Amino acid sequence: MRTSQYLLATVKETPADAVVTSHQLMLRAGMVRKLASGLYTWLPSGLRVLRKVEQVIREEMDRAGAQEVLMPVVQPMELWEESGRAPAYGPELLRITDRHNNPFCLGPTHEEVITDMVRNELHSYKQLPANFYQIQTKFRDEIRPRFGIMRSREFIMKDAYSFHTNMDSLADTYQIMHRAYCAIFDRLGLDYRPVEADTGAIGGAASHEFHVLAESGEDDIAFSDGSDYAANVELAEALAPTSERPAPGAAIEKVDTPNAKTIEELVTQFNLPIEKTIKTLVVKGAEEGQLVALLVRGDHELNDIKAEKLDAVATPLEFASEEEIRKAVGAGPGSLGPVDLPFTVIADRSVAVMSDFGAGANEDGKHYFNINWERDVALPQIADLRNVVDGDPSPDGSGTLTIKRGIEVGHIFQLGTKYSEALGATVLDENGKSVVMPMGCYGIGVTRVVAAAIEQNNDDRGIIWPEAIAPFQVALVPVNIKKSPRERELAEKLYAELTAMGIEVLFDDREKERLGVKLADTELLGIPHRIVIAERGMDNGVLEYKGRRDADKTEVAMDEIVAFLKEKMGMN
């Protein structure tokens, strides 16, 4: 591609409303342009990357035995009513009507549509297992679209759905798809982790998320330094401490703490080690009108997912209001503790081994110091309630945990029969009996993958694309094509030769741009390989090569440049 005939669309300034690196660089590199809130037009450079991501996904889905289909973006609301999701999905589901006043929606996902297709097309166990995928536009009316294409309203997803006669068959396909996802992200050149994930309200036997590691990620990922264990922090088990609870070292003491309504204030004002304090969090109980107190160490955070799974706690998790707490205890939330608390108390495992700790006295402006279990208050029910932290032992017993931020780019799920049962998707088994088909679903955020790749691969000069998804493989930059016939002739020759070999070349044939601008554009775009053609080098029989990830330039003999590039690109 000649730059003079290409919509390069690079800009020097970073747009003020672009917060994350990927959004900034995609705008500056001319990959996308904002049309409206959460809506983006993909320009040529961005689309080239997007199509390469799609192609890798398509190849691996085909290799995994999935069949490609294409379903409508617009879906009839009657399918959503049949599945029961119409009222539950909320305002993210953009509802529309046609000229005949028939209700439709813009599809945020396609479980209903694919299940409707399958119930009409598959009738016998002999047709199973069956796995279908599409790469299609989705629309979710996000209340606050942000971070560019990372969280937009319109986006492209690869969604696949498998159908089975039993859960064993589903488990087999699930593993095939897990391996396919690993192959996809390996080929895309991303540093990622497949992690155990919460199955949520849908339930199901298993769920894994695929996260690209990046500081801008919205999720915390825990993984072991001694094994392959990895999980979303919300799911990672915090093992019980192996140490014994120390014996009491001091008498319990009630202290006036009028200005200490948070753990941070208590620690600061009374010079307490934060790990010697307890937070008391009150939530609604499973029984109507009941409250439950959850205790975690002062330096730990309550894990809402774990708390919600407790039998005594209401689902969904709901924290008690100050009014409800005062009515039950006679004190505000900032003065609560386990001593004489008049309702069910559940303590985290780490709390159970604490001694001489501080907590609220259930009186406004007062705390107990030097509380000890069994001496001052009975040891309550114990459960895993907290988020894991850096340095915790790995739940699989191998190594310790490291916590890093991750961007979720994929999610695979054993759905079970939620949708197939609701929509009556059945087949006849080998005995002629009608059985509901268990389902699996497997999603990849295609547009989000592009942003995640940038978040992980950039420097102060621009994007550093992994080879597999760069918009161009080679940038060909003559220093002064307007005034140097020799540079033009060699550039044209190399361009023709490389293009004939199937190498994607951006030939910067602009006559009015300075060399500095041309080089800055190639670095901003993240093109992996750059050749600079200069008369001075040609006089010495060399050209200048620089890889996008390289710190230094290399001089390469003119007659060896093609072979050199082929070797760099792994084409030999």
Swiss-Prot record:
It comes from the Bacteria. Its EC number is 6.1.1.15. Coiled coil: none annotated. GO terms for molecular function: aminoacyl-tRNA deacylase activity; ATP binding; proline-tRNA ligase activity. Disulfide bonds: none annotated. InterPro entries: aa-tRNA-synt_IIb, aa-tRNA-synth_II, aa-tRNA-synth_II/BPL/LPL, Anticodon-bd, Anticodon-bd_dom_sf, Pro-tRNA-ligase_IIa, Pro-tRNA-synth_IIa_bac-type, Pro-tRNA-Synthase_IIa_type1. Keywords: Aminoacyl-tRNA synthetase, ATP-binding, Cytoplasm, Ligase, Nucleotide-binding, Protein biosynthesis. Signal peptide: none annotated. One of its GO terms (cellular component) is cytosol. The keyword Cell membrane does not apply. It is found in: Cytoplasm. GO terms for biological process: prolyl-tRNA aminoacylation. It catalyses: tRNA(Pro) + L-proline + ATP = L-prolyl-tRNA(Pro) + AMP + diphosphate. Homodimer. Consists of three domains: the N-terminal catalytic domain, the editing domain and the C-terminal anticodon-binding domain. Belongs to the class-II aminoacyl-tRNA synthetase family. ProS type 1 subfamily. Catalyzes the attachment of proline to tRNA(Pro) in a two-step reaction: proline is first activated by ATP to form Pro-AMP and then transferred to the acceptor end of tRNA(Pro). As ProRS can inadvertently accommodate and process non-cognate amino acids such as alanine and cysteine, to avoid such errors it has two additional distinct editing activities against alanine. One activity is designated as 'pretransfer' editing and involves the tRNA(Pro)-independent hydrolysis of activated Ala-AMP. PANTHER family: MITOCHONDRIAL RIBOSOME PROTEIN L39/PROLYL-TRNA LIGASE FAMILY MEMBER, PROLINE--TRNA LIGASE. NCBIfam families: PRK09194.1, proS_fam_II. This is Proline--tRNA ligase.
